[in-house]
Each structure stands twice: as structure tokens, then as C-alpha cells.
Amino acid sequence: MKLLEKMTYVECFMIIMATWFMFISYSHGANVAAAPGTNGLDTAWYDARAAYYGDIHGGGTELEGACGYGDLNKHGYGLATAALSTALFNSGASCGACYEIMCSPNPQGCLSGSIKITATDLCPPGSAWCYLPNKHFDLSLPMFIKIAQVKAKMVPVRYRRVPCAKTGGVKFEVKGNPNILTILPYNVGGAGDIIAVSAKGSKTAWVVMSRYWGQNWTTNVNLTGQSVSLRVTTSDGITKDFTDVMPASWGFGQTFDGKTNF
């Protein structure tokens, strides 16, 4: 009582409002979008649909794909991948992003549990469910049957962004020719999807690279014969420098290990 007597009306009002807000937030938690976590990702759940492609052995994952990763097994992505509809693919900007997906409760054919996948391709535009504004995931069959019965063929799902857990450092595959240097970063942890790449030769200043297609980044600055450092920024705003990741003797077709990750 003595404590209350010393409090002003304003202080009492602020405490009451704070308590009311906490009550509303917790009691309606299922309807409140989750705020971005410390990793800067939007962790709210959204609705979409999912189907599958290929066979039980993962057929189809060895194809190039719209992100440019090529053979997904060779590049370490394996079967835990998905082709995204146009709305989610975002012209290739979502390549490398990781998602947690679970079948929506109750629909026939759904199984409990969830899966985590990396975005590596664009869902075929010829499929009606891949057109704008539909949100859709084409999963490899081995991943689909972890959340739904194969006979369901297509199911409603819920999805959210999650940090990518990758083993080892970021890898950089060198493509192109002396006139156009193209870099494919892969095995990217953290947010996974990249929004900017810059390159610096041992004799040049930093050069901003352009997204060529998918996750391929390019510049027409000739860096042949120079050791090359690469600067990568992921969608959560984190930037990491990979100093002299490419030695002066680098060549086209080679892949270099950044040693560290996000």
C-alpha cells in the first residue's frame, strides 16, 4: 500500500497498459506474426501448397536448375531442396534461402512433423500452381513423403524462413571467360540468400558484381592473374569478406573454399 501511495497516476496507468499489452500478445499469439529474430529473418508462418517431382531416388536433382547450382548432390544440397513458384522465387533473389515446411493440420494425406529445405530452382511456369500470385513448393519426392502421403500428390502447407545450417565454408565456383568473370557462391549459411557480391583484385579496387541469373554474379572487370577477395552480403544485412579466397593462379572452372561461413 505504501508503494502504491507513492506512485503517480501516470505511473499506474503505464503499468496497467504494459500488463494489458502483454496479456493481449500472449493470448492471441497464434494470430500475431512473429517478429524477425536476432538473425534478421522474418520467422512468421505463411500458407502455401506443395507437390513433388522426380522419383523416390531423387531423380531430377542432378539438373542445372534456375539458381545455377547444377548437380545438387555435388554441391552439397542433396535432396533437401525445392523449386519455388514465381511469387517466392523473386527473380532468383531467393536462391539459397532455407525454409521449414509442414503440412497444414487436418487435410487428408498430411503427416505430422516438418522438413527444412533450401531453395534451388524455379517451379516450372507451365504449371498453373506456379503462376503469380500462388505460393508453391515443388519438393523432391523423398522430402515430400516426410510430410504427406505420396497419394495426396499436392497438399496445403505452412512455411517460414529459417537460418541455413551448412557444414564448412562458403564455396565459390569460378565461371565465365577473361572478358566476363562469373562467380557462383554456394553452401551459404545464415540467411542463405545473397543480395550483393563485390570482388577486389590485388591490383584493383572493389568492384560491385551484378546478379547474372539465379545465384550467379558477374563482372566485366578483368581480374586474371590477380588474387581475388570476395565480399558477400546476405538478405539479413550481414556482410562477410573472404580475403584472397582466389589465389593469383586461379582459373575458370575451379572452386575455392572460403573456409568460414555466415
From Swiss-Prot:
Q: Which GO terms describe its cellular component?
A: extracellular region; membrane
The family database entries (InterPro entries) matched by this protein are listed as: Expan_Lol_pI, Expansin, Expansin/allergen_DPBB_dom, Expansin_CBD, Expansin_CBD_sf, RlpA-like_DPBB, RlpA-like_sf
Q: Where in the cell is it found?
A: Secreted, Cell wall; Membrane
Expansin-like CBD domain span: 179-258
Name the keywords, alphabetized. Cell wall, Cell wall biogenesis/degradation, Membrane, Secreted, Signal
Q: What biological-process GO terms show up in the record?
A: anatomical structure morphogenesis; plant-type cell wall loosening
Matching entries from SMART domains are given as: DPBB_1
Cross-referenced Pfam families, in alphabetical order?
DPBB_1, Expansin_C
Q: Where does the signal sequence lie? A: 1-29
Membrane topology per the entry is: Peripheral membrane protein
Q: Which residues form the Expansin-like EG45 domain?
A: 64-169
Q: According to the lineage, what is the superkingdom?
A: Eukaryota
Q: What does this protein do?
A: Causes loosening and extension of plant cell walls by disrupting non-covalent bonding between cellulose microfibrils and matrix glucans. No enzymatic activity has been found.
Q: Which family does it belong to?
A: Belongs to the expansin family. Expansin A subfamily.
- Report the protein name in the record: Expansin-A21
List the source organism: Arabidopsis thaliana
